[in-house]
Regions:
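Asp-box/WD-like beta-propeller blade repeats and closely related beta-sheet repeat scaffolds
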Residues: 87-118, 126-129
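Hydrophobic beta-strand segments that make up the repeating blades of beta-propeller
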Residues: 41-44, 80-83, 123-125, 174-176, ...
Length: 309
């Protein structure tokens, strides 16, 4: 009976013709990030402070580590698992060791988000703002940071990003999703996907991406514009590259179904809804079989999306 109920969840998703979804794993408690480990298992962080591991068809995830502080980013690098948490990044090993890599980072309204490995051997981390729209007192807020795997050489790569939740390298190019401010009304500003280069300023809090105008608004001298404008207040979060396009989850709003709760595709700069029917889609990754994996924070299910045979 449980297998039938889980299969019904996948059947409730709405996908374009030629694609289908299946349940990769279920029974998760608010999944936030995913990374495949050296053992081939998929490791998943849960915002309740746990990391679990799953394989395709898992209904009862295995606990890998507990006692974490709101883990939102995961990255396996060799035999070390890097975890971004509130104010810090830790390195975990299978034998039980736990090491602080970077600490003392600012957090309040937002915190540290995705962590990814760059082609230069450094690690890259999204660091959200401490407020909705204010002048930060800590230069590491509202930035993308980079550092060596041992935590040394911390640098600010880009600034002016209110909450750069998702990070993704496609070759040598770094992309980020950005959550826009909340104080400009229901129709502004756009959520953003940006292409990041060292030294970029993306404008927050004085400049924002206008969804109505599809251009920057406010005080925007020297600001780098986004490559895609997404629905306001939809919470653009997870990002993946699949079948030649960028895909982004829109988590939505906690108490409203008005915005988001969909998976969007960005093709040639145009944004369109690719899949709907989720509760709160959040994390994205691809698996070795070539599927796109979507972790639904709201339902505790990871879906595998693939092209129909």
């Amino acid at each position: 009976m449980r297998a039938l109920a889980v299969a019904a969840l996948a059947a409730a998703l709405h996908l374009p013709a030629g694609y289908h979804a299946s349940v990769y794993a279920s029974g998760l408690d608010h999944p936030t990030a995913m990374s495949f480990g050296p053992d081939g298992r998929l490791y998943v962080s849960e915002d309740v402070g746990k990391i679990v591991s799953v394989t395709r068809g898992t209904y009862a995830p295995g606990v890998f580590r507990t006692g974490l502080t709101v883990p939102l980013g995961l990255l396996w690098r060799g035999r070390t698992l890097y975890v971004s948490e509130s104010g810090k990044v830790e390195a975990l090993r299978r034998g039980g060791s736990r090491r602080l890599v970077v600490g003392g980072l600012p957090f309040k309204e937002h915190q540290q988000d995705a962590i990814v490995a760059g082609p230069d051997g450094r690690l890259y981390l999204g660091s959200g703002s401490t407020c909705d729209a204010c002048k930060e007192t800590n230069a590491r807020s509202a930035t993308i940071l980079s550092f060596r795997p041992d935590g040394s050489g911390l640098q600010i790569v880009a600034r002016g990003l209110r909450n750069p939740y998702g990070l993704l390298f496609v070759g040598k190019t770094l992309y980020a999703t950005v959550n826009g401010r909340d104080d400009l009304g229901d129709g502004e500003p756009a959520e953003e996907v940006v292409r990041v280069r060292k030294g970029d300023n993306f404008g927050w809090p004085l400049c924002w991406a206008s969804y109505a105008l599809r251009k920057l608004a406010g005080t925007c001298g020297g600001v780098t514009p986004p490559i895609a404008y997404l629905e306001p207040h939809s919470s653009a979060d997870g990002i993946a590259y699949w079948q030649g396009d960028l895909f982004v989850t829109e988590w939505g709003e906690y108490l409203s179904t008005k915005h988001g709760r969909v998976l969007v595709r960005i093709h040639a700069g145009k944004v369109s809804t690719f899949a709907s029917g989720f509760v709160h889609p959040l994390a994205l990754t691809t698996d070795p079989a070539g599927d796109l994996l979507v972790a639904d924070w709201g339902s505790g299910v990871i879906y595998a999306v693939s092209k129909s045979p």
